[in-house]
Amino acid sequence: MGLPWYRVHTVVLNDPGRLLSVHIMHTALVAGWAGSMALYELAVFDPSDPVLDPMWRQGMFVIPFMTRLGITNSWGGWSITGGTITNPGIWSYEGVAGAHIVFSGLCFLAAIWHWVYWDLEIFCDERTGKPSLDLPKIFGIHLFLSGVACFGFGAFHVTGLYGPGIWVSDPYGLTGKVQPVSPAWGAEGFDPFVPGGIASHHIAAGTLGILAGLFHLSVRPPQRLYKGLRMGNIETVLSSSIAAVFFAAFVVAGTMWYGSATTPIELFGPTRYQWDQGYFQQEIYRRISAGLAENLSLSEAWSKIPEKLAFYDYIGNNPAKGGLFRAGSMDNGDGIAIGWLGHPVFRDKEGRELFVRRMPTFFETFPVVLVDGDGIVRADVPFRRAESKYSVEQVGVTVEFYGGELNGVSYSDPATVKKYARRAQLGEIFELDRATLKSDGVFRSSPRGWFTFGHASFALLFFFGHIWHGARTLFRDVFAGIDPDLDAQVEFGAFQKLGDPTTKRQAV
């Protein structure tokens, strides 16, 4: 049977045994990829600096997902939060990866068994003697089992009743750790940034799934509904399954890109909106104001700012700055961050503090403009020196650093001042090592960007797939050109055709 590549799935159309086999093989491939990818990432991952070189800067993709579910230790003797450990236990990163690979191998063998032994009694309709599947019953079974898994995850794993809990952090991604989470049953449970909503929603959705599964196991669909939705056709199952998958893909693309409790910034990197809104900058200034109110000097106040918080306030960590098709991790772009140089404070010769206007997300280049506290432009780096009025040289701008490696150092040399003004456009200033990885200086996106792009793209494709297969199953008689209720002998081109009421027809 010479089938074109896009029609090969017809070989499992009326063969339940081999339909099961190919799905088990698909599970084997998915689990095998997950385990293998985890081992590859562990081989290249450097856990030595969780503050300035976290997993998302190194381009890790599956390690963040394991971590958010409660895995933090490695058989290599390190912990994701820093430091060393002596007894990581069986459920380390390597343990989870190994479990996926073993599971993949077992699924591979099961797929082969079901391909060879396809003609099982369980798939045979005792009334007709032909292979058939009771699809509404199978739907009920799957709904019930997925409901049990969903409820179990929310009630046991997330709450810590039997499991580690999940990754929980503060709003600024500084204190993250794995901990048990209590369900949030009030209105706060609908806040996407409240971890308790993860527990309560899984418990609620799982309960609903269990009840719905039992309903579909005990109640048969009405005949009109069964026929109207083509519930006996396996392509109906394909269409509705694709709908479930693309809907989920759109949802997770949103929760990843806009941020939520399920996508902590310590594991996936900050969102672009945190740069756009000056989210971390505002928190830093709030802490500085609080420090000054406690009679600390500027230098002391800035020295108390966590390096982790300052690093989030850097445009190179904005996932929207990397192009969609620039391969590689963030470290391959602007380099590996080594240390925070400190916060530069610019002043003109009259002593006014000046603020460098920050680069918006979608600009590659941006004019260097310094404004005072009232937003009035006081200095810039001009494009045409002949027409300049506010150049650094003319205004006499100086820069002094507070906190970081250059704490207390000041510069009045215009070339140096301009250098740091340009760098201040990009947020807090860091020393970056571009030699080790031969980084090219062009920003890359974080796993947050890749995940969003991949899931949004495939969701769109799967949406079209849902429409396609839904239309095929609902209008199969129209596409075939023959009425499914027709039992008269027909000859193509001579007898009953679509829209020809004169041809012979005998209704059932």
From Swiss-Prot:
<dbReference type="GO" id="GO:0016168">
    <property type="term" value="F:chlorophyll binding"/>
</dbReference>
<keyword id="KW-0157">Chromophore</keyword>
<dbReference type="InterPro" id="IPR000932">
    <property type="entry name" value="PS_antenna-like"/>
</dbReference>
<dbReference type="GO" id="GO:0045156">
    <property type="term" value="F:electron transporter, transferring electrons within the cyclic electron transport pathway of photosynthesis activity"/>
</dbReference>
<keyword id="KW-0472">Membrane</keyword>
<dbReference type="InterPro" id="IPR017486">
    <property type="entry name" value="PSII_PsbB"/>
</dbReference>
<keyword id="KW-0934">Plastid</keyword>
<feature type="transmembrane region" description="Helical">
    <location>
        <begin position="140"/>
        <end position="156"/>
    </location>
</feature>
<dbReference type="Pfam" id="PF00421">
    <property type="entry name" value="PSII"/>
</dbReference>
<keyword id="KW-1133">Transmembrane helix</keyword>
<keyword id="KW-0602">Photosynthesis</keyword>
<comment type="function">
    <text>One of the components of the core complex of photosystem II (PSII). It binds chlorophyll and helps catalyze the primary light-induced photochemical processes of PSII. PSII is a light-driven water:plastoquinone oxidoreductase, using light energy to abstract electrons from H(2)O, generating O(2) and a proton gradient subsequently used for ATP formation.</text>
</comment>
<protein>
    <recommendedName>
        <fullName>Photosystem II CP47 reaction center protein</fullName>
    </recommendedName>
</protein>
<keyword id="KW-0793">Thylakoid</keyword>
<keyword id="KW-0812">Transmembrane</keyword>
<dbReference type="GO" id="GO:0009523">
    <property type="term" value="C:photosystem II"/>
</dbReference>
<comment type="similarity">
    <text>Belongs to the PsbB/PsbC family. PsbB subfamily.</text>
</comment>
<dbReference type="GO" id="GO:0009772">
    <property type="term" value="P:photosynthetic electron transport in photosystem II"/>
</dbReference>
<dbReference type="GO" id="GO:0009535">
    <property type="term" value="C:chloroplast thylakoid membrane"/>
</dbReference>
<keyword id="KW-0150">Chloroplast</keyword>
<comment type="subunit">
    <text>PSII is composed of 1 copy each of membrane proteins PsbA, PsbB, PsbC, PsbD, PsbE, PsbF, PsbH, PsbI, PsbJ, PsbK, PsbL, PsbM, PsbT, PsbX, PsbY, PsbZ, Psb30/Ycf12, at least 3 peripheral proteins of the oxygen-evolving complex and a large number of cofactors. It forms dimeric complexes.</text>
</comment>
<feature type="transmembrane region" description="Helical">
    <location>
        <begin position="457"/>
        <end position="472"/>
    </location>
</feature>
<feature type="transmembrane region" description="Helical">
    <location>
        <begin position="21"/>
        <end position="36"/>
    </location>
</feature>
<feature type="transmembrane region" description="Helical">
    <location>
        <begin position="237"/>
        <end position="252"/>
    </location>
</feature>
<keyword id="KW-0604">Photosystem II</keyword>
<feature type="transmembrane region" description="Helical">
    <location>
        <begin position="203"/>
        <end position="218"/>
    </location>
</feature>
<feature type="transmembrane region" description="Helical">
    <location>
        <begin position="101"/>
        <end position="115"/>
    </location>
</feature>
<dbReference type="InterPro" id="IPR036001">
    <property type="entry name" value="PS_II_antenna-like_sf"/>
</dbReference>
<keyword id="KW-0148">Chlorophyll</keyword>
